[in-house]
Curated annotation (Swiss-Prot):
It catalyses: dUTP + H2O = dUMP + diphosphate + H(+). One of its GO terms (biological process) is dUTP metabolic process. Involved in nucleotide metabolism: produces dUMP, the immediate precursor of thymidine nucleotides and decreases the intracellular concentration of dUTP to avoid uracil incorporation into viral DNA. One of its GO terms (molecular function) is metal ion binding. InterPro entries: dUTPase-like, dUTPase-like_sf, dUTPase_trimeric, HSV_DUT. Belongs to the dUTPase family. Its EC number is 3.6.1.23. Substrate binds at residues 171-173, 273-274. This is Deoxyuridine 5'-triphosphate nucleotidohydrolase.
């Protein structure tokens, strides 16, 4: 019988409660009030450090019934810094998350990376070696006005990998500027990538800029049937995200840089939020 992979983590935060660290998903809940101002990015320092098992990446997202949108972050194996959640206020006035109104989830997934000798259209090699996702660049210049949603159409079919599904995720660098990308499947006929500007400024993105990332999730992680080990709030109701069966192992030394893996994967370390550099 195959041993259950372990996610190593360290956590210490007086403002968050570790509600659950069961097989597959770790959940934190806010113990204090979080104020989100209109058209301003809010970051929540989690006091959480995590390392995925070999062959896995980590996914970080938030859920709430309040009018607040969370950036879905892809945590690369080489990232060694503190995890932080990026939130955007959907309203044009203050929103308040009272205690227990925000749940923060961390889960693992299996992935693969296609072998590309050269860049293929808008699909580029990642900035850091060992990153989970491929970089995807804009095919044209783009302007997003405050609270505007724009779709970018990509018609080039992505490289195929057996038993894996190409999926689009946003970048933390753009999310910090108020631009959130809605995760979605990239199918053979192309994909329409949806970007929303939650900031109070018009944001100009130049052609060829990295604006999202392409992650090849193992097909096991995408399902149309709900289960206690899946979440419809990550990718959407048509493709529920089902996390990998991993056990969480608390290793306090991770917060002090005792990562092991970080020594093997040089280059990223604490840069970015785990899903991109800034």
């Amino acid at each position: 019988m195959e041993a259950c992979p372990h996610i190593r983590y360290a956590f210490q935060n007086d403002k968050l409660l570790l509600q659950q660290a069961s097989v597959g998903r770790l959940t934190l809940v806010n113990k204090t009030t979080i104020l989100l101002r209109p058209m301003k990015t809010t970051t929540v320092d989690l006091g959480l450090y995590a390392r995925p098992p070999e062959g896995h990446g980590l996914m970080l997202w938030g859920s709430t019934s309040r009018p607040v949108t969370s950036h879905v972050g892809i945590i690369d194996p080489g990232y060694t810094g503190e995890l932080r959640l990026i939130l955007q206020n959907q309203r044009r006035y203050n929103s308040t998350l009272r205690p227990s109104e925000l749940k923060i989830h961390l889960a693992a997934f299996r992935y693969a990376t296609p072998q590309m000798e050269e860049d293929k259209g808008p699909i580029n090699h990642p900035q850091y070696p060992g990153d989970v996702g491929l970089d995807v660049s804009l095919p044209k210049d783009l302007a997003l006005f405050p609270h505007q949603t724009v779709s970018v159409t990509l018609t080039v079919p992505p490289p195929s990998i057996p038993h894996h599904r190409p999926t689009i995720f946003g970048r933390s660098g753009l999310a910090m500027q108020g631009i959130l990308v809605k995760p979605c499947r990239w199918r053979r006929g192309g994909v329409d990538v949806s970007l929303t500007n939650f900031s109070d400024q018009t944001v100009f993105l130049n052609k060829y800029r990295r604006f999202c990332q392409l992650v090849y999730l193992h097909k096991h992680h995408l399902t149309s049937f709900y289960s206690p080990h899946s979440d419809a709030g990550v990718i959407g109701p048509r493709s529920l995200f089902r996390w990998a069966s991993c056990a969480f192992e608390e290793v306090p030394g991770l917060a002090m840089g005792d990562s092991g893996l970080s020594e093997a994967l040089e280059g990223r370390q604490g840069r970015g939020f785990g899903s991109s550099g800034q």
